[in-house]
Amino acid sequence: MAVSSRNVYYRVWQSFLEGEYYLCVSNEILEEYAEVLSRNISVNVARYIVYAILERNNVRQINPSYKWNLITADPDDNKFVDCAISANARFIVTEDHHFNVLRTIPFPKVGIISIDEFLEKLQSR
């Protein structure tokens, strides 16, 4: 699995492959990954990538037992929030503005950061 070194997300992907951070996913999230990937590549390759992600030691498969429904503008985004809460994740990395509502919710507290902020955290290690 490769991402071009010219791609803005290259460092994020390489850091993932090197085990520099944990990725928490649920079955719903994995299904979305496969769906999004298959828009640009074949369904079989998308499935392979999802399988390869699952094989990494720095992936935590989470089965959220509660749906918080904190994002009303795009309820489909809640799968990421529910997973993050269940995993006790430090933050969600996203560029999706629907997640901004999480900054105003005192409980449960879910941190959100942009990809650029995440890249800064990776570089400061």
Predicted regions and their residues:
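Short, well-structured N-terminal submotif of metal-dependent ribonuclease cores
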Residues: 1-25
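Hydrophobic/aromatic ligand-binding patch that stacks against planar heteroaromatic rings
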Residues: 15, 53, 83, 104
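Conserved beta-strand segments of alpha/beta enzyme cores
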Residues: 22, 58-60, 111
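Glycine/small-residue-rich phosphate/adenosyl-binding loop
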Residues: 26-28, 33, 38, 47
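Residues at the C-termini of beta-strands that transition into short coil/loop
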Residues: 27, 65, 116
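Active-site neighborhoods of divalent-metal-dependent phosphate/nucleic-acid chemistry enzymes
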Residues: 58-92, 97, 101
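Acidic, PIN/NYN-like endoribonuclease modules and their adjacent C-terminal/linker elements
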Residues: 71, 97-125
